[in-house]
Amino acid sequence: VCHGTPLPKLWDKYLEYQKNNYHSEIEDISFRNKTYGYHSGTMRIQFKNGKTYYGSARVDPMLKSFFKEISSRPSCYQCYFKNLERCSDFTIYDCWHADQLVVGLADDDKGYTNLIVQSKKGEQVLEKIKQDFDIYPVDTERAIALDGIMVRNAAHPHPKREEYYQDMDRDEVAEHIEKFIPITKKDHLIEWSKKIIYRVGIYRFLKKKMS
């Protein structure tokens, strides 16, 4: 299930911004890295000079604009594939509430995935590979209600989206995004604290206590 696709131009500007910040070419990118757990997807960029950048949707300008629905292409707001009857063999999307869908299943913060089989071929493929996975039957409509709102619903455009793209070339990308979607000192403090408590080994423990 697709959340949306930002314009390639914005992505290219973001990559240049990161390369300039780290004075290095990029070796690898993970858009939703799980270093801090499944519920804390993070942008991770590994550079050829050995440095690594981590930034969650709280502080990373690209992720923040993506999840605030301001950076997607116009076609994303009128997506023709937003329905349950699809031409694919499978529909796959994040399962954030596995413990509410399957009795006795614990949320280990490593991640579960919702899977809807859409075709006969999909059934045949699943039959061949099911021994390699832990599979739990769930109610499709309940799973969609909990985690799959975008199975049927397209992204809603941010009210300032047109202005956002019209002015994109005037500023460096992080400054530009900051104008429309501010990243606060509180955001940076929370992000900094998260990295510290992760390094001392208590991050997941605290997340469980607060959930």
Task: Report the location of each language-model feature.
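Long, compositionally biased charged/polar accessory segments in the mid-to-C-terminal portions
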Residues: 24-211
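Long, charge-dense
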Residues: 1-12, 29-32
